[in-house]
């Protein structure tokens, strides 16, 4: 690790983008496999080794020696002769996998220095701990969404041709051999079983190399968003000064904790907000939301801007139906596991001027956040807590654990969901989810003891409910009693609490 840090400092001082020689350094492979290579050296054959032993010191050293002695990297990536010119001849898939994992570490180096330079210029961003919570975005919506009228739901298109990705990364990686090697890996993935497609496009799957796939995806999204921001800035009458670079914003919301691991976070957790006087832009989980107070014609223009941008710059055909434009008053939109909507409350006010009295009708917009019950039950069904109809079932995989362990696991799941969905406007759905988890826990315990649920619940008594009715820990939060009349402030079902300790989406809420 110390050698790696020294190389980074040398790289930073000289500003020479020579990444390719790092492939011949053993410690890079240790970082790629997330463990050291100083353990005992096995002498078994590769076929008899597990995954942990396959990435051992002996295999890595032999691989480096072979790369020194022979020219394993055949650069030709032509569609016609690619089958004859594959990395390492494809005789050893293990070598290709080890090299690709190490290469995914290496290509992140230029981005790490980009991140460091951003933090050195604006160190106060790292001090904004409260804004690291993803729940902090909902009060932002609540304060601004009342003045907005239209929302555009954009599904970011992919896959993309490998050559377009290589051209995009040329601005960041100026080491020609590294670009050639990246091209080889992209074509390898396009021709492999999990990535194969008729048009030989690269799909951002995480089956082959999760780290490299996420790095390429973030680079692709960063490129098209940079172009979008440039177009938006030029089209605005006022010069926008409220947006920052993606790297800085990702750190701003606490998505990157280490300088070495740059732009490799799961894109399901990536969150970025672009704001000016007229529109708000949010990207989350492979989707984008464009909310504006402009007219429907303006939103349609931006829709075709997106389509032309993907077609002309990335050679992607994005069907128009992948971009939906709606009025905020007429629909709800899914964001960070919540179903959000704007509801209009009509009220009648009686006014009197001198001897004349009249009725005046006013409308007040209210920002609603509810739990998408159908999607959440679908997530619970995938985890075997219930069926698709919401009927609780026993979780057989936990039946071998102790009773206290089973109850603690179910209670933890229930508390985490209650904590994450503390900002929902209606708590009745949460009560139903708690009921499903409580009865699923009872069925699991009854299955373990070969008893019925009724008999088991009678035996446990009220103590069984403690794990599911335990109070939330007191943490710093946003609490908005002003959103409700005074008579409702004491009603727990109407309180919305946004916690400041939530830095990622709940696994069950992440159902898309």
UniProtKB/Swiss-Prot annotation:
Keyword Cell inner membrane listed: no
InterPro entries: Domain_X (IPR024937), Maturase_MatK (IPR002866), Maturase_MatK_N (IPR024942)
Keyword hit for RNA-binding: yes
GO terms of molecular function: RNA binding
Pfam families with a match to the protein in the record: Intron_maturas2, MatK_N
Domain of life of the organism encoding this protein: Eukaryota
Major subcellular location class: plastid
Entry's localization field: Plastid, Chloroplast
Gene Ontology cellular component terms for the protein in this record: chloroplast
Keywords assigned: Chloroplast, mRNA processing, Plastid, RNA-binding, tRNA processing
One GO biological process term: tRNA processing
Family affiliation: Belongs to the intron maturase 2 family. MatK subfamily.
Function: Usually encoded in the trnK tRNA gene intron. Probably assists in splicing its own and other chloroplast group II introns.
The protein's name: Maturase K
